[in-house]
Amino acid sequence: MSKSWRELTIAFAGIVLATKQVAQLAKTGYLKTDEFETSVRSLFERNPASTEATYGSGHNLAEAFEELEKLLNNHRDPRNADLLRYVLGVLHLQKKLIKRKEMLYVIGNRLEKAETQAQHFGITHDNVISNIAEIYTDTLSKFPYRIQVTGEATYLQQTRVASQIRVLLLAAIRSATLWRQLGGSRWQLLLYRNQMAKHTHELYLEFKR
């Protein structure tokens, strides 16, 4: 596997890691703490040593690689419908965001403040998550296009769940930005889906626990 394909696949798995948690939260109200921490930490990795370092380690993406492989091989499967919709929504929203330099500045500046707060309270402390969620609300939620999250109203109406979902969508957009910086595009997904599925499987075998 070439270095470029490896990095592209890792970054895209970062999108899947965050969006699959959105789907899980919306339907069950719960998520895996370690996966949530990986997604939140990725928001604070502005100058990582490598693409993999954005997520701490490739091992933290093992389940995301597995999920991405399923998505690439069975994208028409109704069971993948919500995840696929969230992934495509994130790619669309990120493309809008990249044209708004002032919004990017606001997000970056406020994430720096949230990182300082996380160093004091802990990365998944309620105050930290609430502040990051507000960044999403004050910026990306202002676009006419909004990602519609579907699930159980019982969970979606909970403040905790709503905040975690916004944080995860912001993390997904951060990974989408990284993916595009590495040369990723939607055309690539259409034309080289089988090749990407192959690389995803190789990475899953490398990093599965």
UniProtKB/Swiss-Prot annotation:
<keyword id="KW-1003">Cell membrane</keyword>
<dbReference type="InterPro" id="IPR035932">
    <property type="entry name" value="HflD-like_sf"/>
</dbReference>
<dbReference type="Pfam" id="PF04356">
    <property type="entry name" value="DUF489"/>
</dbReference>
<keyword id="KW-0472">Membrane</keyword>
<dbReference type="InterPro" id="IPR007451">
    <property type="entry name" value="HflD"/>
</dbReference>
<comment type="similarity">
    <text>Belongs to the HflD family.</text>
</comment>
<keyword id="KW-0997">Cell inner membrane</keyword>
<keyword id="KW-0963">Cytoplasm</keyword>
<dbReference type="GO" id="GO:0005886">
    <property type="term" value="C:plasma membrane"/>
</dbReference>
<dbReference type="GO" id="GO:0005737">
    <property type="term" value="C:cytoplasm"/>
</dbReference>
<protein>
    <recommendedName>
        <fullName>High frequency lysogenization protein HflD homolog</fullName>
    </recommendedName>
</protein>
